Structures are given as structure tokens and as C-alpha cells.
Amino acid sequence: MKRIFESREAVFAGFLVATLGVGCVTPGGGGTELFNGKNLDGWEVTDFAGGGAIKVKDGEIHIAMGELISGINLAHENIPRTNYELEAEAMKLDGNDFFCGLTFPVGDTFASFIPGGWGGTVVGISSIDGMDAAENETATFKQFKTHQWYHFRVRVTPGKIQCWVDDEMVVDLLLEDRAIALRAGPIELSVPIGITSFQTVTRIRNIRLQPIKP
């Protein structure tokens, strides 16, 4: 079974290379690298009004503080909709709100994992049954330090959304009979996969996508 699964990973990596181009997709031991560390090939700067400047330097994506939301989104939609993990590492340098919002597919819809929103401490999923991360049962509270790298991971299966901050599981949401959607507004531009910050100075690195066993 392990050999079959590894073969599926190789096929998946090859598929992404074929559709997105070798500039942004590099097979790696921890999944498929969506960011090549050199430029934003395969990505686009999301057209948020008043978004902060974005550049690549020293193998990281540097996002300056914007008026409100800033970020990037994958420039292609040929990605898995379920049975995958998405992960990224992020560091907040300044600001008091979320610094690595991850927008991702959930079947035929999308959701966002928000670490450190609503003043810097709320962690959760937006939106569930029309309620934001601060309002629904995924809401937890966590202090995020500046100048410290955090590892964020999202796992999507047909039955669940699970999220981790470093090694701590912070979301374990059953999807049956739940209405999953993006919060209405600018975040709807952050598809099919997006990374966003809200009035923060942010560094992003090691963006990976990996299929998992059904």
C-alpha cells in the first residue's frame, strides 16, 4: 500500500508540474512545493484594494502592511478539491491581526483558515453556516509572537476539515450537514488557493500541497 500511495504522489506532482509549470511546482519530500523560493511563478498578487507590496527575497514571500487585506493566490485551478493537505510557514513582523490566512477548496466550495484574526488571537474557519471564525465552534484563542516562524497545516477530506498550528490541532470539523463558504467580500478573490494577511507585515515560506489517502 505504501508503494501505491507514493506512486500516486508522484503522479500528482507530475500533474501539477504539467498544468502549473516547473517554475512554481517542485516535488519535495514533504509534498509538492507550490513556491519555488525565487519568484511568484504560478501565483498572482491578489487584486485587493489597498493591498501591501509583495516581493520575493531570500527564499521568502514578503508581504508589506496594506490598508486592509493583502495577499497572493494560485493562478490555476487544476488542484485537488479534497483528500489533500496544504501547509505553509509564516512569521509576523508587525501588526495585530491575521498573518497567514489560508484559503482552500472544500469539494465544490472554499473556506479560509484564519490564524490570529480579530485583533490577533482568534483561530478558526470562515465561514460555517454563515458564521465567521470568531462566531462558530472552530473559534479558539492563541497568542502569536512576532519574529517567530509558525507552521500551519490544513487537511481536507470528504468528511472533515482539520487544521494545525505547529503540532497542535486547532480545528477538527465534521462537514456533514454543514454549509461551508467564504466570507462575503474581498476574500472571495483569494481562490483557488490563497494566502492573505490583514494589516500585518508578513513573511511566508515552504508552501506545500500533498495528496492523502482517501
For every predicted segment, state its role:
Residues 2-12:
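Bacterial N-terminal signal peptides that target proteins for export
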Residues 24-214:
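Carbohydrate-interacting regions of secretory-pathway proteins
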